[in-house]
Regions:
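A short acidic-Thr-Gly-centered motif at the start of a beta-strand
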Residues: 116-117, 209-212, 320
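Short alpha-helical segments and helix-capping/turn motifs at coil-helix boundaries
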Residues: 55-57, 202-212, 448
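Cysteine-centered catalytic environments shared across enzyme families
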Residues: 1-183, 190, 217, 465
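Residue-level preference for long, well-ordered alpha-helices that form the structural scaffold
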Residues: 97-104, 195-198, 298
């Protein structure tokens, strides 16, 4: 399991190895004599980045087998060894862009075909985004019957576009309207255990529609289709950075708010105990050095994929898969390798994703695409693409000339929080179990969390950690 799609947690005690695919089960069934302690560094990393490092858990004594590795336990010596059997390739293809695009599409189609073998009832999560449009394009082009699923407020861009697609391509759409978001609080403990306490609670949103999906044979999920085919935050400077400088440059970039970090450097230094002032940057460099055989642009992609992807997105899929088979075409090994080999310059600004849709799935390209609060158009209708490009500039938050389009996760979610969750969040903050430890500056913590409209991840991570501590210590 080279991407850790199935987690394995373990510890050694009195010359025996104990392991489980469930973190909480492993804790619940441990011997009373086996003492566990809170992993303070993991707590800080989670608060800072909304994710974990590839082996971290919230318990010092319990580890997780990292991606692309196998674990062996020697019964005679009672020692473990972890060996790597897969790693990222440092090669970038020299093929023409046209040939690369053709190969990516061939591998994409093969990947979906494997997910659908023997499956009669097929579902996909439909939104206005690129991931679901790519899946939709394949199903429509092959005339495969399926059911679409969408959830959220009725006036969100994603919901509006999902309904447009359903009408245009004549598929059944199951829509779950969010009149409120109380399900976050009501199902908190259930969802925390399902995700091994490794997901900020605001990322629990896919679980609210599982009951509607439970009769499907498979749900095609778009996670990871975008990771390397859009070259997330691609920067030209990475093309020419020498390897001996790449670790330091990329570590500094990841330390900035927005790249990889929820907290900016100033906020982090205020919140974290002084003894941890250099912990995050030093940890980044240590982890990046493990991958420094890669050229700079691939080093950036690999690190982002591993920690934001395998440790942030995968818990959603792991939890959902306990109810229904959630298939990830984006993690098919042949598809992954095909996209990985493409130079970053071909993937920037969603170029490859747009060309994939325009060249092979034109039928679904005439409906607008949604990126947060921005709209893309890649269809053939004259003038519409130019119109949306102009609107994108006029509505950009940086300029504020026109009001931006409906941005649920960036704006409207806070109205729901204030209506449905604010008293609960305030109470959780006041009684946060991390305040009983010294790795945080308590006054600064309370001051930071008293602010209005913090990044969602700040609420999500702190509440999950606190409730984990209360349950297990």
């Amino acid at each position: 399991d080279r991407f850790s799609t199935i987690p394995f947690y373990y510890y050694i005690y009195k010359n025996k190895i104990y392991g489980s695919v469930s973190f909480q089960d492993l804790i619940n069934k441990k011997s009373k004599d086996f003492k566990i302690t809170l992993n303070e560094e993991a707590c800080l990393f989670f608060l800072k980045t909304n994710t974990f490092l590839n082996t971290q858990t919230l318990i010092n004594e319990i580890s997780r087998v990292p991606y692309g590795c196998s674990l062996e336990f020697n019964k005679k010596t009672c020692k473990i060894s972890i060996s790597r059997y897969w790693n990222f390739t440092n090669k970038t293809s020299k093929e023409s862009y046209e040939n690369l695009l053709l190969d990516v599409n061939d591998k994409f189609q093969s990947s979906i075909n494997k997910c659908l073998i023997g499956k009669q009832k097929i579902g996909i999560n439909i939104s206005g985004g690129y991931d679901s449009r790519q899946l939709l394009g394949y199903l429509v082009s092959k005339k495969i019957k399926f059911t679409g699923y969408n959830y959220g407020p009725t006036d969100s861009l994603d919901s509006i576009v999902a309904k447009e697609l359903s009408k245009k391509h004549d598929f059944n759409l199951v829509f779950k309207n969010w009149e409120n978001i109380k399900f976050y609080k009501e199902n908190l403990f259930k969802y925390m255990e399902l995700t091994d306490y490794m997901l900020a609670f605001h990322h629990f949103h896919p679980f609210n529609i599982l009951s509607e999906q439970k009769n499907e044979d498979v749900i095609l999920y778009g996670h990871f289709l975008d990771f390397h085919s859009q070259a997330w935050k691609y920067q030209k400077k990475y093309e020419n950075v020498p390897n001996n400088h790449s670790v330091s440059i990329i570590a500094n970039d990841f330390n900035l708010a927005g790249h990889f970090s929820v907290l900016n450097d100033k906020e982090q230094k205020k919140l974290f105990n002084f003894k941890y002032k250099d912990y995050f940057l030093e940890t980044l460099k240590k982890e990046l050095n493990k991958l420094n055989f890669l050229p700079a642009e691939k080093l950036y992609d690999a690190f982002y994929f591993l920690h934001h992807g395998t440790r942030r997105l995968l818990p959603q899929v792991q939890a959902a898969s306990k109810t229904i088979y959630y298939a990830l075409p984006g993690l098919n090994t042949l598809y992954f390798d095909s996209v990985w080999n493409v130079p970053g310059k071909f993937k920037k600004k969603n170029k490859m994703r747009q060309d994939l849709l325009k060249n092979y799935y034109q039928e679904v390209s005439d409906t607008k695409l949604v990126r947060d609060d921005q709209i893309d158009y890649i269809g053939k209708k004259f003038g519409i693409n130019t119109f949306y490009k102009i609107m994108k500039i006029l509505k950009h938050k940086k300029f504020g000339i026109l009001k931006s389009d409906y941005d649920f996760w960036g704006q409207q979610i806070y109205e729901y929080i204030e209506k449905d969750l604010e008293p609960w969040i305030k109470n959780e903050t006041k009684h946060n179990a991390m305040l009983d430890y010294d790795f945080l500056n308590k006054d600064e913590f309370l001051k930071y969390y008293s602010k209005k409209r913090l990044p969602l991840s700040s609420y999500g991570t702190s509440i999950v950690i606190s409730n984990f501590i209360k349950k297990n210590f």
